[in-house]
Swiss-Prot record:
InterPro entries: EryCIII-like_C, EryCIII-like_N, Glycosyl_450act, Glycosyltransferase_28, UDP_glucos_trans
Activity-regulation annotation: The activity of AknS is substantially increased by the addition of the accessory protein AknT.
Role: Involved in the biosynthesis of the anthracycline antitumor agent aclacinomycin A. Catalyzes the transfer of the proximal deoxyhexose, L-rhodosamine, from dTDP-beta-L-rhodosamine to the C7-OH of aklavinone aglycone to yield aclacinomycin T (rhodosaminyl-aklavinone). It can also use dTDP-2-deoxy-beta-L-fucose, TDP-2-deoxyfucose, dTDP-4-amino-2-deoxyrhamnose, TDP-L-rhodosamine as sugar donor and epsilon-rhodomycinone as sugar acceptor.
Gene (UniProt): aknS
Catalyses which reaction(s): dTDP-beta-L-rhodosamine + aklavinone = aclacinomycin T + dTDP + 2 H(+)
Gene3D superfamilies per record: Glycogen Phosphorylase B
Any GO BP: antibiotic biosynthetic process
One Pfam family here: EryCIII-like_C
Organism: Streptomyces galilaeus
Known EC number: 2.4.1.326
PANTHER family assigned: STEROL 3-BETA-GLUCOSYLTRANSFERASE, STEROL 3-BETA-GLUCOSYLTRANSFERASE UGT80A2
Keywords: Antibiotic biosynthesis, Glycosyltransferase, Signal, Transferase
Signal peptide, first to last residue: 1-23
Protein name per UniProt: Aklavinone 7-beta-L-rhodosaminyltransferase
Length: 443
């Protein structure tokens, strides 16, 4: 079958799709990855075939222009709809309005959607897998009759929030599942998607938001309840297009507990800032009887006033190679870093401060596999004390090992491919372009 993956142009949101894309290719399926031109180099560096669509999203302008308002609205706010009192009607309406106006419509602007639909009409994919903010994928699928699903790399709290918001509005999901095919006037996301689909003469229903099903790479302990089908899949680390090289020093077992410090890749390549100063983090580890590996680029290093003797600075090292040698990790809360540490069984200190990073860190702490240190509460003493606890108390390592086992109990991307073949055959609204909709090895 033909499979089209699509993600807006940010590496952190694309990387989670690479292992499944390659599993599909290895099973004999044709795969294309569509995104704005800025992601083309990353797609091709992953060995995949890129389809540039639209123009590059102006994320830097968004952050500079309305970023303070967006970030202040979301910062340090849990997104867990199941926690009483967390998500007020005012917050949910503000979230829906702000995210649709300043983010969703920016990364799925009309030229991007039009180009993606045009490509899908010509190439006729059987299945479209879309990053959960890249609603253009759902639009293209509904226009062309392809089956479609969201590919999740982080807990699906955004969908829980949407259900909570629609319930507060007293609005049933539009379409066959419950509503009358129209959206509530205060449902900004639904209104925009209804208008966008209307440009192609296609009615809106809630599948344009939810997908027909989801492929979820998050362990079950972190998945909120879902009213849509979910295909669980093991997270397989792909740490981006940087050089995946094991340096000489990493081939030698550490003589002291090794701790990874990383503030992620997104802040290096975008206007989204790190909330915790690098200098503060390194001061917190100074003098401890540990070996610290800090992944910092030249700009981040320029902010340092002092490098402790127990700190090794490296520009880039693949986390999936580094973390198996580590006793702990201190990080910014990014989903890729968090997921890689989780599947490697490494206790974590996550300094999450926005969106789902807060809830992932809080849940990790509740499960005993790490500690959450909100970015606005980070001090040298507080971070040092938590790190000492993480290293000294065996319960953290044991809990992290349990989460690793949970993650490993999920099917691999290769094992998920036959499931996707069956679901595609069930949900595709047209006949396949040519015979052979399943791979030869599947009966």
């Amino acid at each position: 079958m033909r499979v089209l993956l699509t993600s807006f142009a940010l590496d952190a949101h694309f990387n989670g799709s690479v292992p499944l894309a390659w599993a599909l290719r290895a099973a004999g399926h044709e795969v294309r990855v569509a995104s704005q031109p800025a992601l083309t180099a990353s797609i091709t560096a992953a060995g995949l075939t890129a389809v540039p669509v639209g123009a590059d999203p102006r994320l830097d302008e968004m952050v500079k222009g309305v970023g303070d308002a967006v970030l202040s609205h979301h910062a340090d706010q849990s997104l867990d709809a199941d926690t009483p009192g967390q998500l007020t009607p005012a917050f949910l309406q503000g979230w829906d309005t702000m995210m649709t106006a300043t983010f969703y419509t920016l990364i799925n602007d009309d030229p991007m959607v039009d180009d993606l639909v045009a490509f899908a009409r010509g190439w006729e994919p059987d299945l479209i897998l879309w990053e959960p903010f890249t609603f253009a994928g759902a639009v293209a699928a509904k226009v062309t009759g392809a089956a479609h699903a969201r590919l999740l790399s982080f807990p699906d709290l955004f969908m829980s929030m949407r259900r909570a918001y629609l319930a507060q509005l007293g609005a049933a999901p539009a379409g066959p599942a419950g509503g009358n095919g129209t959206t509530h006037p205060d449902d900004s996301l639904g209104q925009w998607l209804e208008w966008t689909l209307g440009r192609y003469g296609v009615p809106f229903d809630e599948e344009a938001v939810t997908g027909q099903w989801s492929v979820d790479q998050v362990p079950r302990s972190f998945r909120p309840p879902s009213d849509r089908p979910v295909v669980g899949m093991r997270y397989v680390p792909y740490n981006g297009p940087g050089p995946a090289v094991v340096p000489d020093w990493l081939r030698v077992p550490p003589t002291r507990p090794r701790v990874c410090v990383t503030l992620g890749m997104t802040a290096r390549t975008s206007e989204f800032p790190n909330a915790v100063p690098v200098d503060l983090v390194l001061k917190a580890v100074e003098g401890l009887d540990i070996e610290v590996v800090a992944t910092l680029d030249a700009e981040e290093r320029a902010l340092l006033t002092h490098v402790p003797d127990n700190v090794r600075l490296v520009d880039h090292v693949p986390l999936h190679a580094l973390l198996p040698t580590c006793a702990a990790i201190v990080h910014h809360g990014g989903a890729g870093t968090w997921s890689t540490a989780l599947v490697e069984g490494v206790p974590q200190i996550a300094m999450g401060w926005i969106w789902d990073a807060i809830d992932r860190a809080q849940r990790q702490q509740a499960l005993g596999a790490g500690l959450h240190l909100p970015s606005h509460e980070v001090t040298v003493e507080g971070l040092r004390g938590r790190l000492v606890r993480l290293l000294d108390e065996p319960s953290f390592t044991a809990a992290a090992a349990r989460l690793r086992a949970e993650a490993e109990s999920e099917p691999t991307p290769a094992q998920v491919v036959p499931v996707l073949e069956r679901l595609t055959a069930q949900h595709r609204a047209r006949e396949p372009r040519r015979p052979g909709g399943t791979s030869p090895c599947v009966s």
